[in-house]
Amino acid sequence: TDFFIDGFPVLRGKWLKFDEDRFLKKFTEKYLRNKKLDSHRLAQQKGAKILGFKKYYKFHHVPYALRKSTFESFFESNKEIEVENIRYKFRNLNQFTPQGLINHLEIKNKTCVLSNKLQLIYMKPIRKSLWELKYKLNSFSDNKLFLCLQSLDQCKPNKLKYLLNWLTFLVK
């Protein structure tokens, strides 16, 4: 299927160095004042570090195939890691994403299938002109399984109307 092959979850993404191992990231964090931290990416990296990885598998905005049994077995043996992660009332840079940790555990245990074929159209319509939006959506092809449209609540009415009409047409 699109999510499991022979019972193993399909993980879509790519291998990347940790931010602190990337020259450009280090340079921009040191010399640019308006640095914006990507807490989700850092939380993915933290999950990989907990398990001893030297780089991380970056998961994109696609549905994750997760096995409840992997969560249960890991946190049953590592209760202190779970307790530390959930102790914060709000998102905190000391936290890891549970799905990122578990996906890296699946990789470590060789109990998953890695795929660099994202089969994804991802966009933030508020950052695109209506023309760019139309172009990108019209490039949607049969080999795409997933669509992620961010911040629709912030779209201008004409873009939102176009998107909703396009989605309605797509599902008919």
Describe the role of every protein-language-model region.
Residues 2-172:
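ER/Golgi luminal nucleotide-sugar-dependent glycosyltransferases, focusing on the catalytic module
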